[in-house]
Amino acid sequence: MPSLPVAAAEPMAVDESASKKSKRKLKAAEVEVEASSRKKEKKEKKRKAKEPSPSSSSSSEEEERSSTSSDEPAPAAKKAKKEKTKEKVVVEEEEEDDDEGELTASGDEDPADPNALANFRISESLREKLKSKGIKALFPIQATTFDLVLDGHDLVGRARTGQGKTLAFVLPILESLVNGTHKASRRTDYGRPPTVLVLLPTRELAKQVHTDFAFYGATFGLSACCVYGGSDYRSQEMAIRKGVDIVVGTPGRVKDFVEKGTLNFRSLKFRVLDEADEMLNMGFVDDVELILGKVEDVTKVQTLLFSATIPEWVKKLSLRFLKSGKKTVDLVGDEKLKASASVRHLALPCNRAARAQVIPDIIRCYSRGGRTIIFTETKESASDLSGLIAGSRALHGDVAQAQREVILAGFRSGKFLVLVATNVAARGLDINDVQLIIQCEPPRDVEAYIHRSGRTGRAGNTGVAVMLFEPRYKFNVNRIERESGVKFEHISAPQPTDVAQSAGTEAAEAISSVSDSVIPVFREQAEQLLNSSGMSAVDLLAKALAKAVGYTDIKKRSLLSSMDNHTTLLLQTGRSVYAAGFVLSTLKRFMPEERLADVKGITITADGTGAVFDVPSAEVEDYIQGAQNAAMVTVEEVKQLPPLQEREQSGGSRGGGRFGNRRFSGGGGGRGGGGRGFGGGRGRGGGGGNRFNKRY
């Protein structure tokens, strides 16, 4: 290794404490004198006999070194050799210090932190992978459960979403497979069955967990695949048949592969249920129990169950499928996070495709002309959305620090009033007069919701926090309510009439502020227009205001999905409505069957006496007029959504066909199997019923 200049060692000490600095300097001085003395050993035997011990004071050593250099100057060659020796000694000392304080010098770990990576049985290669992601220490749930899992215990872990539950099972499972109890039984042959199965309620969660297993598992040559509905079945099947170590997936697709015989659990060592309470909420009870029940020898399988809450089904699940000696780790307890009482919390159903049209209208109706912060989950969506909203700026991780400061200064000063930001980029914002917060989707982490919504309603002010959600993922709204204590006020997207009225009010105020000096210039044209229009002055002025704010006509907007040019209708039949199939059958009595393809989002009312659904606005009159010719049927346009059911009473949550979600599942269970007239398995229409099965 080439020698480094002595100065190269100095930066290593910049961040050291004063005491450590002194100790290091003293040690360097001692080594330096010792090396110098050794070189003169042959010529100065008497001096060698009197050579100071390593415990001598630094001042005596400095005097001795000074005397040596002044009284007996060395030749040039000897001096060069001496400098080389000094360099070598100091560099060696630097390398020693590097080894000793490696984790702090590089800014990685703090050994004083009990949760530092070095304090756990994590292999060096995996530690390096974690450091590459900026992870220096384990989160509480990870630290608390690591040894329990690695030592082979079944586990029930309770922690809020977003607290690091994924790595709480990823890390110890990987270590166990490669360096722990399962090392000897590890297989690498073609077609091998999986050793790890992880179940999650949604494809988004499954993909996130799969990403972690794939990234960290690659360190040990472990392979992982992700299986979920709505994607290519064949490619997932081939991945399993080739042989895989870890399978991550949603219950429905995993069940398919199990029943087909593609997936077997003969070599299974771990099974993990993450977000177990959400699996209950989404109707996966039967699927989960069937999958867990396929393990023949449970004594050879370690089961890990993670959940934010422990409802009765989760308790029964743990008693039935986990060993009696299971461990429980609860980081939630009875605590309940609190959102600001000065904030009005609103939840608004909105399909992803409608966001760009709906968000500007939310701003117009709820911001009161003040500042708005819009939170997105990705920097790409932040950039895209800011490009669609006039007068807005994006703030995310790709924005340079200098530009970030310019953007924040402009937002604070009011140069622009809408900031579109990712959660990470918005940390540290301290702006008291933000009137409106919009979250484009429910965050996985309830703390993130409270943190974001708390950006408004500060310093004694009141504010509004609007959270958008896709109707089929309404369970995420319930989760945040449950974990945070927030009670959402459920609203529909601002209707074009609401937005137009708001814009008209602003335009009227602007007109009132126009100087009277312009009246003579426009009076003649105004009189001509009034005389020729045949309208009253008020009506004519109303049209002028509409034109001024860009409204030449008023469009319709769905109350159910926020989609433009769609209208929400309410159907009632004078008797109970149990399923979407019944609604479609009723509509078929007075509407052509081909028109029913345009019916979207059928949802049963909370009292079970009717159902709401969307149709193209141009067809509204056809439905209303048609219902008048059908006995005991009424169809009307709704101005405000009535209370709605979470899911159909049939209990199905993933019904078949193009309407494959909880609203359209047939009777007979959680996945739309065998329902009357609208059953079918996850978009394939399997299951009994009439002609609507395959079509819808």
UniProtKB/Swiss-Prot annotation:
Enzyme's top EC category: hydrolase
Binding site residues for ATP: A159, R160, T161, G162, Q163, G164, K165, T166
Comp. bias (Basic and acidic residues): 27-38
Location of the region described as Disordered in the Swiss-Prot/TrEMBL record: 1-116, 641-696
Coiled-coil intervals: 16-97
SUPFAM superfamilies assigned to the protein according to its UniProt record, in alphabetical order: P-loop containing nucleoside triphosphate hydrolases, RNA-binding domain, RBD
The organism's place on the tree of life at top rank: Eukaryota
Keyword field contains Nucleotide-binding: yes
Subcellular location: Nucleus
One Gene Ontology cellular component: nucleolus
InterPro entries assigned: DEAD/DEAH_box_helicase_dom (IPR011545), DEAD_box_RNA_helicases (IPR050547), GUCT (IPR012562), Helicase_ATP-bd (IPR014001), Helicase_C-like (IPR001650), P-loop_NTPase (IPR027417), RBD_domain_sf (IPR035979), RNA-helicase_DEAD-box_CS (IPR000629)
Bias type Basic residues, positions: 39-49
Catalysed reaction, written as an equation: ATP + H2O = ADP + phosphate + H(+)
Annotated ranges, domain Helicase ATP-binding: 146-328
Motif (Q motif): 115-143
Enzyme Commission number(s) from the entry: 3.6.4.13
Keyword Magnesium: no
GO molecular function, one term: ATP binding
Sequence ranges of Acidic residues compositional bias: 92-112
UniProt motif (DEAD box) ranges: 274-277
Biased composition (Gly residues): 652-690
Record-level GO BP terms: RNA metabolic process
Protein family (similarity comment): Belongs to the DEAD box helicase family. DDX21/DDX50 subfamily.
PANTHER family: ATP-DEPENDENT RNA HELICASE DEAD (PTHR47963:SF8), DEAD-BOX ATP-DEPENDENT RNA HELICASE 47, MITOCHONDRIAL (PTHR47963)
The record's note on its domains: The Q motif is unique to and characteristic of the DEAD box family of RNA helicases and controls ATP binding and hydrolysis.
Protein name per UniProt: DEAD-box ATP-dependent RNA helicase 7
Organism, scientific name: Oryza sativa subsp. japonica
